[in-house]
Curated annotation (Swiss-Prot):
Main location: membrane
Compartment(s) where it occurs, according to its Swiss-Prot or TrEMBL record: Cell inner membrane
UniProt source species: Cereibacter sphaeroides (strain ATCC 17023 / DSM 158 / JCM 6121 / CCUG 31486 / LMG 2827 / NBRC 12203 / NCIMB 8253 / ATH 2.4.1.)
Superkingdom of this protein's organism: Bacteria
Example of a GO cellular component annotation carried by this entry: plasma membrane
Name recorded for this polypeptide: Putative membrane protein insertion efficiency factor
Pfam families: YidD
Keyword set includes Electron transport: no
């Protein structure tokens, strides 16, 4: 992971350590948004990974999506499926 990606991962790790135990396990997606963010930063670096993580976190609300949504490149079988 690049140094900038490591810096961007710090708030996610802090959330997982400090807030997640109190908030509970109510993520709409699988993998959870925090796991997705760390995986996106690891696979795609700070810029693209940060964009993917931000987009995912912003879509996590009652009117957003839900279900299985892995980071692009993490599940080639899922990546090949047509969207829609």
């Amino acid at each position: 992971m690049s140094p900038l990606a490591q810096v961007l991962a710090l708030p996610v790790r802090a959330y997982r350590l400090l807030l997640s135990p109190w908030v509970g396990h109510g993520c709409r997606y699988q993998p959870t948004c925090s796991v997705y963010a760390l995986d996106a930063l690891e696979r795609h670096g700070a810029l693209k990974g940060g964009w993917l993580a931000a987009r995912r976190i912003l879509s996590c609300h009652p009117w957003g999506g839900s279900g299985y949504d892995p980071v692009p490149g993490a599940d080639p079988e899922h990546d090949r499926r047509p969207r829609g």
